[in-house]
Amino acid sequence: MEKQAKVLDASVVVKWFSEEENSDKAINLKESYLNGEIILIIPILTKIEILNALRYKKNSEEYLKKVNEDLENLQIKIAEINNNLLDKAVEISLKYNLTIYDSIYVAIAQLYGCQLITADKELFKIPDVVDLGKI
């Protein structure tokens, strides 16, 4: 049986490093990945968003560098951001009135034919987007 791929946005991945609502569910997704049960896909943008979010939570430089290293060591599949993906993101952004940043995640999920899991309420209006709190 082929492993299911899932796109995670930064609102989910940041919960691996910061105790928040539904952090347990986010960590369960990471554990499923580490156990080889699922494939995780993120754009490189995710790492930037996570480090930025954690920076504003008053974390130290040392901690932020450790998070960056931990993310690298996980070897999560990084979706290439190319013109095809950006064109799809623009289309989604205009259709649903989203930022291009958020639309990138939706576009990746659509192009890979898999679920996007998010804790971002703004994305719940998109068909086939999964609320982290409901998994």
Where are these regions (language model features)?
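Alpha-helix capping/helix-boundary segments
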Residues: 12-13, 46, 85, 105, ...
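Acidic active-site catalytic centers that drive phospho-/nucleotidyl reactions
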Residues: 9, 102, 120
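Structured helix-beta-strand junction loops
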Residues: 35-37, 73-74, 112
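Active-site neighborhoods of divalent-metal-dependent phosphate/nucleic-acid chemistry enzymes
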Residues: 77-115
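Short, well-structured N-terminal submotif of metal-dependent ribonuclease cores
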Residues: 1-42, 57-69
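Acidic, PIN/NYN-like endoribonuclease modules and their adjacent C-terminal/linker elements
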Residues: 1-5, 79, 106-135
